[in-house]
Amino acid sequence: RVGHIRVFAAFASLASLVVLIHSVIIHPFIWFLLRILTGVSMVCIYTVAESWLNDRSSNKNRGSVLSIYMVILYGTMGIGMFLLNFSSPKNFQPFILVSVITSAALIPILLTKKKPPNFKKIQAMNMRELYEASPFGMVSSLFYGTIQSALFTLLAVYATSMNFTILEISIVTFLLAISGAVAQFPVGKISDIYDRRRVIVFSTFGAAIFAIIAIFVSRQMYLPGGLATSKTWFYFFFILFSFCSLPMFSLILAHTNDYISKEKFVAAGAGLQFAFGLGAMSGPFLCSIFMDLVGPNGFFVFLFIFHSFIGFFGIYRMKVRKTVENPDSQFVAMPQTITPAGIELNPTTEHIEEPYSEKVKEILERKGVKYKKDENEDQKEEVTY
């Protein structure tokens, strides 16, 4: 009703002011409400940005656009962790810095001369349809949402409780984002060659094993020769954990697409995102219970258990259902935060109906060519003489 630019500006402003309120009112319940507002704002911002990218992409460059988007998303996520070192997290300065960066994102959007696209209504599969199409896809997406939300939300809490310095916390969170982005492509290539369920099972059990190893190397770690106390080995095994764990959503999406027609790829992706979101709501709460019962290492115990759940369920599904070869389905790296609008950037989905450019319209209209909207198809234009 109000357009992309106004929606982006409104929710970016809301996100910016919500961050500042954190430093004004320090109360757990108020922060709980503020986090809800932040989540709503970020989903709306992502939806606007990804639908805009989708509208500006053609069938020839959708994959490239998605790859660049992935690099920017994970890269800035990793670099952003180092902002913790500008000031103590106990002070109000970090909140101001986040608010400033969020507000700065408005400048290029508000000054653009490009015409904003129209929103597309994307209907997600309901949970029953999604489960019938791919039980393993839906269940693993639900569990993985639980894993991911706990991982990104409580990693800093775990590191703080293990007496990591602020710089070391920044390094750990940076390694999580960057190694996860780098792992997308080799893991995806392997999944295009072998049964995706087998790749998912090996990845989940690999992540579970490295989570347990991380527990044993997280306290006193020494460089070869006993040079100095160091967290080098923890970083090393945490990178291996990220390599196994972070490509999971893209693998789950590709696996689900193996069992459905190309026309349903976007709807299935939206359904998986919904299942992922349901799991994500419970992740931090469940993980915090483990950390209360076991101590800080309950963080990795939680990750071990839920990765194992996915792995064992995958083994069960391989016994009751044969793999299929869908020529329309292939692995495409996708961030976990992607919205249904962004899923359309997946080059394996249906071709985008590309309307004539404004310049072509102007030239043809000079020659007596008239345009009219086709009543049977949304957003499609045809030429009539």
Predicted regions and their residues:
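Intrinsic disorder in cytosolic terminal tails and internal cytosolic loops
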Residues: 117-124, 317-385
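Structural signature of the two symmetry-related core transmembrane helices
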Residues: 6-20, 99, 198-213, 304
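Intracellular juxtamembrane helix-capping segments at the cytosolic ends
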Residues: 44-57, 246-260
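C-terminal membrane-cytosol helix-exit motif in multi-pass small-molecule transporters
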Residues: 84-85, 99-119, 310-318
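C-terminal transmembrane helical hairpin of 12-TM major facilitator-type secondary transporters
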Residues: 197-249
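Helix-to-loop junctions at the C-terminal end of transmembrane segments
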Residues: 1-4, 88, 183-195, 291-292
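Cytoplasmic helix-loop-helix junction between adjacent transmembrane helices
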Residues: 36-71
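Loop-to-transmembrane helix entry/capping segments in MFS-fold secondary transporters
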Residues: 59-69, 166-167, 260-272
